[in-house]
Amino acid sequence: MQIDLNADLGEGCGNDEALLALISSANVACGWHAGDAATMLQTVKWAIEKGVAIGAHPSFPDRENFGRTEMQRDPEAVYADVLYQIGALAAMVRAQGGQLHHVKPHGALYNQAARDPALAEAIVRAVRDFDSDLIFFGLAGSKMIDVARKAGLRVKEEVFADRGYNADGSLVKRGTPGALHEDEEVALNQTLTMVREQRVRAIDGNWVPIRAETVCLHGDGDHALAFARRIRERLGAEGIAVRAGA
């Protein structure tokens, strides 16, 4: 058995180089919610050195709120936003002799697209038009996975180590009870259950089927690095290899 571990990097959290030794895929902020040209280039260099798959992590234009504020943007504007950000990161990857591997939307763009097919279509179209060989990372079982698959893109269904789930498979909204698992053991056990059993316990206590193809480890928490090490150790002990895959 194998699983991909991904993390959102280039967001100014200071753990990036160390985290890259523990993950298999990196989602690099493209400057619209965090980061800038210098952080993008540095993160790309580190990822190439460590053999980590590189993905673009496009956002709504929202640096003030770290890309976590929902917006009602015209689909054509979103298409242009995403295409612009992918292109910027891809240029840096290419200049360093690497190859862009995937695209994962960030924050509010991700969460809205998970339930809004029109928004998802704009994002997916930008990815496909830029490079139809790119892999699309999206919330497991969501509308954006369906849209990406129908558009002919390869997908990876994403689950979250430290986030709570609703009964419909959506993430519990940040700022509400149960949104984040502060207890590392709870997050570790949730991750192993999702990977091995392809299910997750929702906040209402019921089990929800879930397809876990890539696990997101948040890189912006106080204990992000220590938690990533524990995840790697537990996966290794269970005989589960960590690989980006194709």
Swiss-Prot record:
Keywords: ATP-binding, Hydrolase, Nucleotide-binding. InterPro entries: Glyco_hydro/deAcase_b/a-brl (IPR011330), LamB/YcsF/PxpA-like (IPR005501). Pfam families: LamB_YcsF (PF03746). GO terms for biological process: carbohydrate metabolic process. Its EC number is 3.5.2.9. One of its GO terms (molecular function) is ATP binding. It catalyses: 5-oxo-L-proline + ATP + 2 H2O = L-glutamate + ADP + phosphate + H(+). HAMAP family: PxpA (MF_00691). Catalyzes the cleavage of 5-oxoproline to form L-glutamate coupled to the hydrolysis of ATP to ADP and inorganic phosphate. Forms a complex composed of PxpA, PxpB and PxpC. Belongs to the LamB/PxpA family. PANTHER family: 5-OXOPROLINASE SUBUNIT A, UNCHARACTERIZED PROTEIN YBGL-RELATED. This is 5-oxoprolinase subunit A. It comes from Cupriavidus pinatubonensis (strain JMP 134 / LMG 1197) (Cupriavidus necator (strain JMP 134)). The lineage of its organism: Bacteria, Pseudomonadati, Pseudomonadota, Betaproteobacteria, Burkholderiales.
